[in-house]
Amino acid sequence: MKKRSSLYSCGVLGAAFVICLVVSSCGKNFFFAGRNLPPSGVLNRVLIAEQNPSAFASGALPFDDAFYDIRHAYNASSGQFTIAGFSGKLPLTIENLPEQEGGAVYNEGDGSLSIVSYAKESVSSTVSIPGGFSSGTEPSPYNGISLTRDLGFVYAANPGNHVISVVNQTSNNPIALTLNLPNAYGISVNPGGTVALVFIQNATQASNYAVRAENPASFAVYSIVQLTQAQQAAATNNPNYLGAQDCEPQKQPVWCVFPVSTGASASFDHPVKAVFSPDGTAAYVVNCGPECGGTTASLTTIPITASSLNAGTTGGSGIALTAQSNIPIPNGATNALFNGNTLYVAGQQYQASSGLFTGYLTIVNTPANTVAGTYPISDGLHNRMVFGDNNTLWIGSSQCNQGVRYQQAQAGANVPFGCITMFNTASNTSYIDAYLGDGTGIAAITGLGKVYTTEGGQIYIYSTTPSSTGIVSLDNSNVTIAGTAIDCAYMDAGSDDDNTIY
């Protein structure tokens, strides 16, 4: 049997090699969705943000072959695939844009954004953030920097310098500037790039709080907007044009940051991010509430209509946004992810008996704005969510060893308290892994029934099919790295939705 299996394997590999030769000789350089065949020839690549790979470097971007789970060519025994031309310091997060054959890596060590070409497996450009270092994501559940999916605009928040950075990379009007906004720390941009929301650290906002009726610096959520030429002329030397918090450059403003009003049934309580409905008609702001020092965890809906957008311009254009309603999420809300009209919300609820928080996943029916169910998940700050194969939702958290589950385990209970949860959306069943450190990255390798994670600074691999005892770990011995693995992304995913934080 062993000999027959070996001969069969050799035959399969040989056939695959012949096919590759035929494809190459015929000049075909695409593998699916019209994407270019990359220089490495690897079709299932996982990008790793690696900090301090050696004593002589503070950052690297290696990538693995997720089909074979190796970091080098399948017909070699050593070496490592890597993104060429990368010089960023301490890469922290990866914004995965496989539909554009690229990605953006934020480097916290120098405050830059590296634009990576997946097609060429090299850095195509580096964007300097004019306002300096943007807010980091670890261990917080938000992100402070975002590249629009059309690769045209970069928005970044810097709570230390109290500014928002705007970089317009489009050829018709390139510009880089900062807008003054105290304590701005989170950025969420819709897939179409027409709405760019900014969140204020530790902020609240009551209902019936309207632009022009209140101090423009006293809101909890803002919107970055590019002005039309007529508006630019009208806003000259008026940083508070139409109730804006700031407009820059002041002599002839091009960009403004406008407050988001609240209606009679809407409010904000420590908002941390927003997710957008699949049809693009609404933003759902995640209010962290008690987990972030506030009172009530909830979702706040903001309708996105033609009348609320600034017609005749590009980039952020949410000039007249008004929040309309709140959906209470009693079990906590720090992150959320849509699957059709169902919104999965991760967060923690305070437990008075222990004085600690414990993790929950709340399922929301958005057409009815009602909670359909709540289920236990890992404790900690839930900063990563992504859908995988076999009806699975994967959730990563930081500081999961500071919650109720860890306390119970220390007292002798047989309770897993790891930072990665696999949730089966068909059976509504949670599987929590063993503790390996903070869960800082997840890449769903769709089509192959596995996910890659970065936990405690190392790379791990899991099957999307559980066993009777829980999550199944796969062999990671050929993908581990010397430095600190802080994030990961599936470069060859089918869509830009294979992201975890953006």
Q: Over which residues does each language-model region extend?
A:
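Predominantly soluble domains enriched in secretory-pathway, periplasmic, or organellar proteins
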Residues: 26-502
